Amino acid sequence: MRVLLTSFAHHTHYYGLVPLAWALLAAGHEVRVASQPALTDTITGSGLAAVPVGTDHLIHEYRVRMAGEPRPNHPAIAFDEARPEPLDWDHALGIEAILAPYFHLLANNDSMVDDLVDFARSWQPDLVLWEPTTYAGAVAAQVTGAAHARVLWGPDVMGSARRKFVALRDRQPPEHREDPTAEWLTWTLDRYGASFEEELLTGQFTIDPTPPSLRLDTGLPTVGMRYVPYNGTSVVPDWLSEPPARPRVCLTLGVSAREVLGGDGVSQGDILEALADLDIELVATLDASQRAEIRNYPKHTRFTDFVPMHALLPSCSAIIHHGGAGTYATAVINAVPQVMLAELWDAPVKARAVAEQGAGFFLPPAELTPQAVRDAVVRILDDPSVATAAHRLREETFGDPTPAGIVPELERLAAQHRRPPADARH
């Protein structure tokens, strides 16, 4: 069959598609990957055939223009699972009102959607697999009649939030049932003579790489898949060939700690200083500008701009990180206890779930201090039950099939869900 994968142009969102794309290719299927031009080199660098569509999104420019305003990586975007209070209509509608223009009009801009639909009409895929915010993939499938599914990169906060939003919406008086996302997709589909269906937001089915005990109960048809890490093109450093002489701890926050942690004064330097007296080997992923701020740190510290997590983490006793999808999932499959400094997007959901399983610690902004980070690391190193829980999660993860293992199920589901093109269904 022909399989079209699509992600908006953000490399970490794309990375989660790569192992599945290769599994399909190795099984003999034709595979194409479509995204805005900015991702073309990343796609071809992963060994897959790229289809540039539309113009590059303006998300980064939008962030600058909207500085200080709520946006999807702003604490105002708190999904129900990460909030102590129940989700109400005003909050749910507020989330939708922010997400609709941010992801739906920018990440899936009109030129991208138009070009993707044109390519799908020409190439006629049997199955479209889309990154969970790249709704252009669902639109292209709806127009051409291809089966389609989301490929998640973490707990299904979008599917869960959508289900709860729809339930709250339907309780409102008819004149107050606003739905910005459905309205946008309805207008978009009108251009191609197709109509909106709720499954355009959740897929006809969902491929979920989250371990079952960490999964959200969305009630949606789901295919479990073992997470396989992909870090892009990378080189394994020589020093990883030798086992560490003392417990190895990784510190990686992805971007500057002040940005990730909301500028509350807890910096990477503060954290390093709190760990300075521990007998550990610390591997800290900091660039040159970040290192310049560091004054006091553990004696056995290795600074590096980048190291592939799948190569580093098997040798680690703990990891301190911000809850990024790839870092979290790679820690899970390597049974590494996690200290998660989680605030944004789905990170609190993941961190709370890991902590509830006993496989790590969740430090939300209100509880985050350098001493709290140090205490969590010491607990992990001193309490073997944390490592035991992390190993339990790893074993659970290995109970799911690999990307190659789900290919027969994808073949079956594609045949089940394929339909005639939209213009032939009316």
Curated annotation (Swiss-Prot):
Coiled coil: none annotated. Its EC number is 2.4.1.277. It catalyses: 10-deoxymethynolide + dTDP-alpha-D-desosamine = 10-deoxymethymycin + dTDP + H(+). Keywords: Antibiotic biosynthesis, Glycosyltransferase, Transferase. The keyword Transferase applies. The keyword Lyase does not apply. Pathway: Antibiotic biosynthesis. GO terms for molecular function: hexosyltransferase activity; UDP-glycosyltransferase activity. Disruption phenotype: Cells lacking this gene are not able to produce glycosylated macrolides. InterPro entries: EryCIII-like_C, EryCIII-like_N, Glycosyl_450act, Glycosyltransferase_28, UDP_glucos_trans. GO terms for biological process: antibiotic biosynthetic process. It is an enzyme of class 2 (transferase). Forms a complex with DesVIII. DesVIII assists the folding of the DesVII polypeptide. However, unlike chaperones, it remains bound to DesVII during catalysis, forming a tight DesVII/DesVIII complex. Although the formation of the DesVII/DesVIII complex is essential for the catalytic activity, DesVIII is unlikely to be involved in catalysis directly. Involved in the biosynthesis of the macrolide antibiotics methymycin, neomethymycin, narbomycin, and pikromycin. Catalyzes the attachment of dTDP-D-desosamine onto 12- and 14-membered macrolactone rings 10-deoxymethynolide and narbonolide to produce 10-deoxymethymycin (YC-17) and narbomycin. DesVII is unique among glycosyltransferases in that it requires an additional protein component, DesVIII, for its activity. DesVII can recognize and process not only cyclic substrates of different ring size, but also a variety of linear substrates albeit with reduced, but measurable activities. Belongs to the glycosyltransferase 28 family. This is 10-deoxymethynolide desosaminyltransferase. It comes from Streptomyces venezuelae. The lineage of its organism: Bacteria, Bacillati, Actinomycetota, Actinomycetes, Kitasatosporales.
